């Protein structure tokens, strides 16, 4: 009998890491047509195209809740509208699950986590988190005092943990993050899978450093630009290209003020990021925090060694320090510059680390990550047979 697996995610129209990873995993399972029947249940993007190619074997169900509509209304309407939409979501998701009767329902810990354990459709409920515990709800963009932020975050976390304890299982992306969830014993780690593994490999000879990610404070590009000022003074013939979308104005002002316009370039996000990795010799991750750090394994798959802050969470699970990349004390700009300069100045070390990176990163290929999910599904179904 086929195993029915249902994923709950807001939408699949955004060019985001969570959306791409889910698409990759779902396509892997859907290809096993004799074993799995895959459903993806959405609340947003009813009139938008999917960002990533999805297997025709996958059933996409649009509940048409559209929480996104609340972004353009007054604060009062936001509050009343949210609770109304949340009630509608629960009703429609409950009806949907009772209709399709999945064996396992997976929440990506968005709005449904508040009620999914109450839905009695017979499916096993599990959750997967694509950010780390400490940054599950990032309130830094809200203009409210820090002490109020902490109280709100503490309340949210208490509520979340109560729901997570009711799940049959909970998946996080790194060993480092797992250690933070001391309240839970129904937890394990499954890393994100590589989205690609090209036959080509960077020869690590071009005088190019690359970084990629959204232009927002989390990614720490402000620190990277300060770091590049140090690097460029020693190696003016090298360039840094940062690929992404978002709030670029302040970053460009910073580049201009440091007179780095010729060597530090803010590029638009591109569809052919693989080609950009292959043209580069060093990858840098300057994030303040991560859920995992997909861009690191992408660069490594192209044979490009990474220099990364040892931020929470992900880089320490991915990079084998001094073997296939270099880890730097989190937030230490001077040390980041020093490590980049080290790879610039040591050609053979750089090339060898690139080769080792391409070899070591194979452990994240879908052929290795996919079976971990399948084993989990089988274990859960064996231990929790449907009555």
Model regions: which residues?
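Membrane-proximal helix-turn-helix segments that form the acceptor-binding/catalytic region
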Residues: 91-98, 147-169
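Carbohydrate-associated surface elements
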Residues: 176, 193
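Conserved acidic donor-binding segment of nucleotide-sugar-dependent glycosyltransferases
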Residues: 320-322, 326-333, 342-348, 362
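A conserved mid-protein helix/loop that constitutes part of the nucleotide-sugar donor-binding site
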Residues: 16-24, 207, 211-230, 236, ...
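N-terminal strand-loop element at the rim of the active site
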Residues: 8-15, 28, 32-79, 180, ...
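Glycosyltransferase donor-sugar binding loop
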Residues: 40-47, 212, 239-251
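Short hydrophobic beta-strand element within catalytic cores of glycosyltransferases
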Residues: 305-309
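Aromatic "clamp/platform" in nucleotide-sugar-dependent glycosyltransferases that forms part
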Residues: 269, 288
């Amino acid at each position: 009998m086929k195993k029915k697996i249902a994923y709950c995610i807001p939408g699949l129209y955004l060019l985001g890491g969570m959306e791409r990873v889910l698409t990759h995993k779902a396509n892997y399972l859907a290809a096993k047509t004799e074993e799995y029947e895959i459903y993806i249940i959405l609340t947003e993007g009813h009139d938008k195209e999917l960002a990533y190619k999805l297997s025709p074997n996958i059933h996409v169900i649009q509940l048409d809740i559209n929480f996104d509509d609340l972004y353009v209304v007054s604060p009062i309407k936001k509050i009343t509208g949210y609770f109304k939409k949340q009630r509608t979501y629960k009703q429609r998701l409950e009806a949907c699950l009772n209709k399709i009767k999945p064996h396992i329902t997976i929440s990506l810990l968005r709005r449904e986590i508040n009620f999914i354990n109450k839905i009695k459709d017979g499916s096993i409920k599990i959750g997967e988190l694509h950010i780390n515990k400490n940054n599950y709800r990032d309130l830094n963009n809200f203009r409210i005092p820090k002490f109020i932020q902490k109280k709100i975050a503490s309340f949210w976390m208490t509520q979340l943990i109560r729901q997570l304890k009711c799940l049959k299982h909970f998946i996080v992306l790194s060993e480092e993050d797992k250690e933070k969830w001391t309240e839970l014993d129904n937890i394990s780690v499954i890393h994100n899978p590589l989205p690609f593994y090209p036959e080509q490999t960077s020869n690590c000879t071009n005088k190019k450093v690359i970084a990629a990610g959204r232009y927002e404070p989390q990614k720490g590009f402000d620190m990277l630009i300060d770091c590049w000022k140090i690097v460029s003074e020693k190696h003016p013939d090298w360039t840094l290209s940062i690929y992404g979308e978002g709030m670029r104005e302040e970053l460009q002002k910073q580049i201009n003020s440091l007179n780095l316009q010729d060597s530090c370039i803010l590029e638009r996000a591109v569809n052919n990021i693989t080609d950009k990795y292959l043209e580069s010799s060093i990858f840098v991750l300057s994030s303040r925090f991560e859920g995992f750090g997909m861009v690191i394994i992408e660069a490594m798959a192209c044979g490009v060694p990474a220099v990364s802050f040892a931020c929470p969470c992900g880089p320490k699970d991915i990079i084998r320090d001094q073997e296939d990349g270099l880890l730097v004390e989190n937030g230490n700009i001077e040390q980041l510059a020093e490590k980049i300069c080290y790879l610039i100045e040591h050609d053979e070390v750089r090339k060898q680390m690139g080769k080792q990176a391409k070899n070591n990163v194979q452990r994240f290929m879908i052929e290795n990550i996919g079976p971990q999910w399948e084993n989990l599904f089988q274990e859960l179904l064996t231990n929790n047979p449907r009555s």
